[in-house]
Amino acid sequence: QFTIDILKRDLEEEKIKTDNLVVIKPHRNINFKENSIFPVSLSHSVPDTVGYVLNTQDGAIFYTGNFVFDPTMNYPFKTDIGKLAYIGKQGVLCLMAESRYASKIGYTSPQHRINKVISEVLYKYEKRILFNVFDGQIYRIQEIFNEIMHTDRKVIIMGKRLESIINDAIDKNYIHFDKTRFSNIHNAKDENVIILISDEREKPFSNLDRIIKRYDKFITLNETDTVVFASSVYPGMEKTATKIYDNISRIGCNLIILPTDKYLALHASSEDLMLMIDLIKPKYYFPVIGEYRDQVANMKVAKEAGINEENVLLKLNGQVVTFIDGKLVESKEIISSDDIFIDGKTAGDVGELVIKDREILSENGVVIVSVTLNKATKQIVAGPEIYTRGFVFVKENIDLIKEAEKKALEIINENTKPNFIDFNKVRLGIRDTLGKYFYDETECKPMILLVNGEVE
């Protein structure tokens, strides 16, 4: 239900019909002709998380998704171990289990709990505290709320999406918190308020980055603030996160980053996987999710759990696994699994270089160096002048722009002879020299373009 509520809200914002959304319930079969799917409750950061048993004429396949075993977790985060044991007794052909934490020793629980460190933060820092979380990690948000309830502080939720998700979760008893403790965003300047800031996975730290750059009209960070990163950084986002950490430190805020080796996300560690294998007793084991090295670690866990090495399937994206009459059949079929980029009315024909250029433009902007030359003598008639879009605000960075124009002029003069100019060297020189200069001054790498014109 929780997932459907979020999906429905997002679809309605895009004016997409939501008539065909169906809420599935754990432990009730979903039938598709001769096949069926049986959802079973598992513990994760999202309420009502389920794994799926796909019952086919060739055997049952169980896909875990993300999970942990934690006997202290209650509804709607509780794993139904009895149902897992029942599924195992019925016979499972293949278990597809997540791999992200397979190399970690022991169980994930209780290392996923952050209540103690949150309590310490609330006790130590009496001024304004900002918690950065991911809006889908409801269990972690509940942990933060649990500790806030021991204080007299008010809570502000930044962002309509996060506010809507939390209010709906409270109304449906997914989150337990007193709504009278919520305050309005207009009170964000109060010095002892607590602010929850959330970012979507596709746009990590976007809201916090806007605050750091002083684009937000309600919140301005200062030296007395404390910023807590209460969610693990998703793989591939480490560089972005590091930049955010540095920018917060430059402001002088208290910066608290929960170490990922001490405070784990809700993913199965090696003992969680061992227990799942023991309950399900699969004939074949298929490590999924995570990097390839994680899947290799998961394969080793399965072998230690007693599964024959030839029955552990380690595959690359696109490779096909085929079972016929309960037996693994060799398949050389490959399914294309590369990213497909949709560009306007076309799909799949956008090259990597185009995508890279767009990433640079979106993250660092563009700098255009414009110069006009005499067509005959190649002498400069006007410029060079620099224009920027999405890089810096020119009026506040006049010295930066003037120095860049000076460097561009030097490069043009160095590569100009009577009646001749080497535009290739000029372009490369301007790109390299200004690129280094801008990075040294701003830590940004904008796209740099030379636009030259000639007049009689």
Each predicted region: which residue ranges?
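C-terminal regulatory/interaction regions
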Residues: N146, H150, D168-E456
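His/Asp/Glu-rich metal-coordinating catalytic cores
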Residues: Q1-N187, S206-T220, K239-T242
